[in-house]
């Protein structure tokens, strides 16, 4: 897939926001330059997830930003999202690819070189690797060394996105790893000024990814 689309990857978390406030944040982020959005809301019923996905897709479509659905293949297909992201404990990559078909984007979490190679072989379009730094989004997530991230980038032909505790202040440490982009949750979703924070990320990424 196009590496540029993965440059600044927003992963959502509603925290305590109302639906209206949450959607406003997503809209601001899309307007300000995020290049892809993943809807990741673990605590919703299927219908709640579906309804929220429809609303988010209206926003992402308006800004021509791809929408990725986390975990839920059914919701991805129901709203005709651009793609699906699956983790270690979810559908086998080959099964997800078979159901999605060749046109949808398929992202896969890969914390090791072995998993990265397996995912690539089974049809993944990109990999999400981390947590690079400690994160409150997944409090017990094991840390992936930056050296491991770099090795994964060098080993696979598909793009790799770093994730986990990433902020506009610490992403400089990813210079030279070969990543296609960074996935950000808290530092964007809870920013006081999402537009300014998005621009800060994009400015840093211009140097890191060039």
Curated annotation (Swiss-Prot):
Keywords: Magnesium, Metal-binding, Thiamine biosynthesis, Transferase. Condenses 4-methyl-5-(beta-hydroxyethyl)thiazole monophosphate (THZ-P) and 2-methyl-4-amino-5-hydroxymethyl pyrimidine pyrophosphate (HMP-PP) to form thiamine monophosphate (TMP). InterPro entries: Aldolase_TIM (IPR013785), ThiamineP_synth_sf (IPR036206), ThiamineP_synth_TenI (IPR022998), TMP_synthase (IPR034291). Its EC number is 2.5.1.3. 4-amino-2-methyl-5-(diphosphooxymethyl)pyrimidine binds at residues 38-42, 70, 109, 138. This is Thiamine-phosphate synthase 2. Binds 1 Mg(2+) ion per subunit. Its cofactor is Mg(2+).
